[in-house]
A protein has these predicted regions:
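Predominantly flavin-linked oxidoreductase catalytic cores and closely associated redox partners
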Residues: 104-105, 109-174
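N-terminal Rossmann-like FAD-binding beta1-loop-alpha1 element of flavoenzymes
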Residues: 3-27
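A short beta-to-alpha transition loop/helix N-cap that caps and shapes the active-site region
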Residues: 34-38
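Gly/Ser/Thr-rich beta-alpha loop segments that engage phosphate groups in nucleotides
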Residues: 11-16, 44-46, 162-163
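An accessory alpha-helical subdomain
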Residues: 73-85, 93-117
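Glycine-rich active-site loop/strand segments that organize a redox cofactor
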Residues: 43-93
Length: 174
């Protein structure tokens, strides 16, 4: 299978990236469902952004990274997206925004965005033999239906950290 972008990790960053990447996109995750950490975040209500998010609050070896990233996509942009999907929310302490009903609404929104963009989602799937090639990347995806080779022009590693092992977080790509 030849694609434009392979994304490893179907958490918030991976799904948002997949929905916006354009072209033929495949996203893979080892979990049974996408967005597992989203589902439990904020006590099950998802603290999805902060109204006071600003570049000066981030530490990085590249001090301009947060400034550039937040100029391209602000907390207001995400709030607008949440509103467009009819997700009700409220503000808690210090500008923290939470879903009124459930974090599952954010997961559903991200899945809808990916589906609308034609993204292929592969769950319970591992990426093996990942190699950088002259034209991009090659790998083997191994999942419930066996193994298949894949080539991609672009690769995004959005595997998150190893913060909650009982939720399936591993040190893969950490």
């Amino acid at each position: 299978m030849q694609i434009d972008t392979l994304i490893i990790g179907a958490g918030a960053a991976g799904m948002m990236c997949a929905a916006n990447a354009g072209g033929r996109v495949v996203i893979v995750d080892h979990a049974k469902a996408p967005g597992e950490k989203i589902r439990i975040s904020g006590g099950g209500r998802c603290n999805f952004t902060n109204m006071h998010c600003a570049p000066h609050a981030f530490l990085s070896q590249n001090p301009h990274f947060a400034k550039s990233a937040l100029a391209r996509y602000t907390q207001w942009d995400f709030v607008e997206l949440v509103d467009q999907h009819g997700i009700k929310w409220h503000e808690k302490t210090l500008g923290q925004l939470f879903c009124d009903v459930s974090a599952k609404e954010i997961v559903a929104m991200l899945r809808t965005l990916m589906q609308d963009a034609g993204v292929e989602l592969h769950l319970q799937t591992s990426v093996e033999n990942l190699i950088k090639t002259e034209s991009g990347y090659s790998a083997v995806l191994t999942g419930p239906n066996g193994s298949k080779p894949i080539t991609a022009k672009n690769l995004v590693v959005a595997t998150g950290g190893k913060s909650i092992p009982k939720m399936g977080a591993t040190g893969f790509a950490y």
